[in-house]
């Protein structure tokens, strides 16, 4: 898939105000400082499309971008901020759960994992919740350019073994780098195929 157009559509904190569901939707989420904004900008080829901030997680919003006029890229706030108040955390948890469980045009959620770190409890808990809720997701390992080939492979293997303690098979896994562009085509090809399937399926309803 080639990205021809990418435009910011809207930010929301309420499910009722999200865009209409006629286009397939692909969400990106991860713990704070995982490199989400940089990866989104690299994938779309639009520098500055997703804003990077020195205070990530400050605003709790669901951010929609319209890509190529026929699918939504959704930038979800980073999770795991201890500095948020209890009220803010509860508000975000409710919005996130409602979005994941009720957004009918959500095709895939890309869960971003920092490839430099050992498996983090906060990531594993979220991944397990997604699996139990039967919400389709892809694991995206970020910042692979900051690791040597051997270390990268070792860290990925550790993560796979951790997941296979509870699962019989692994989800789709993509290694990425916002710097080198690694993984960009894999993500876009997956989105392209799923967008075509979404359109074909919905055309049968008309």
Regions found by a protein language model. Give the residues of each.
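Conserved G1/Walker A P-loop phosphate-binding module
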Residues: 1-83, 200-206
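Canonical P-loop GTPase G-domain recognition
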Residues: 3-15, 146-205
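Short, well-ordered secondary-structure micro-motifs
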Residues: 19, 63, 84-85, 120-123, ...
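Hydrophobic aliphatic residues
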Residues: 43-47, 100, 191
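Conserved nucleotide-binding/hydrolysis micro-motifs of P-loop NTPases
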Residues: 58, 71, 78-81, 116-118, ...
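Amphipathic alpha-helical transducer elements in NTP-driven molecular machines
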Residues: 59, 89-93, 121-124, 181-184
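Conserved nucleotide-sensing/catalytic segment adjacent to the nucleotide-binding pocket
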Residues: 68-106
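Conserved C-terminal guanine-recognition region of P-loop GTPase G domains, centered on the G4
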Residues: 94-170
């Amino acid at each position: 898939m080639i990205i021809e157009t990418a435009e910011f559509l809207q930010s929301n904190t309420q499910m009722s105000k999200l865009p209409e569901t006629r286009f397939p939707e692909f969400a990106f989420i991860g713990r704070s400082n995982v490199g989400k904004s940089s990866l989104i900008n690299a994938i779309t080829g639009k520098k500055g499309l997703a804003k990077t901030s020195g205070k990530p997680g400050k605003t709790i919003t669901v951010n929609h971008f319209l890509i190529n006029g026929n699918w939504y890229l959704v930038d979800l706030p980073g999770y795991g901020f201890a500095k948020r108040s209890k009220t803010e955390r509860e508000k975000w948890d409710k919005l996130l759960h409602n979005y994941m469980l009720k957004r009918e045009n959500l095709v895939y959620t890309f869960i971003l994992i920092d490839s430099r770190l050992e498996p983090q409890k906060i990531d594993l808990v979220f991944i397990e919740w997604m699996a139990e809720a039967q919400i389709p997701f892809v694991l995206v390992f970020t910042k692979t350019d900051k690791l040597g080939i051997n270390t990268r492979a070792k860290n990925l293997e550790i993560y796979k073994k951790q997941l296979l303690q509870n699962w019989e098979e692994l989800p789709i896994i993509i290694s990425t780098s916002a710097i080198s562009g690694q993984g960009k085509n894999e993500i876009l090809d997956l989105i392209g195929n799923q967008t075509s399937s979404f359109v074909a399926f919905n055309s049968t309803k008309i």
